[in-house]
Design a protein with these regions (language model features):
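Arg/Lys-rich, alpha-helical DNA-contact motif
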Residues: 1-20, 26, 40, 45-46, ...
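Short coil turns linking two alpha-helices in DNA-binding domains
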Residues: 31-34
Length: 101
């Protein structure tokens, strides 16, 4: 008996909100209340479902892990916010440099 297996390529949109808060918290190894605090501080902006449920993307989970890493290194949330802003700005500048050659 031969079994034919086909490879299916699945591209996942890393910005699509798919994880409810409990799942995102588990993936990031955090308590759901921590995610709510980070949202209130503006560190994370999850998408919302039509019923206003928070939906976190893979990129959001990665950002939560980065926040956790920075706080473990001793930064407070104001410091974390500053570092994330500077990292975003650096990516923008690198993108501009790549575009202009």
């Amino acid at each position: 008996v031969s079994v034919r297996r086909e490879r299916i390529d699945v591209s996942i949109d890393s910005d699509r909100g798919v994880f409810m808060i409990s799942v995102a918290a588990e993936l990031a190894h955090m308590h759901p209340q921590t995610l709510r605090i980070y949202e209130a501080r503006g560190l994370i902006q999850p998408k919302r479902s039509p019923k206003n449920t928070r939906l976190y993307s893979q990129r959001d989970v990665e950002r939560l892990r980065r926040i956790q890493q920075l706080t473990a290194e001793g930064l407070n949330l104001a410091g974390v916010e500053r570092v994330l802003t500077l990292e975003r700005r650096l990516r923008e500048l690198e993108g501009d440099a790549d575009a202009t050659g």
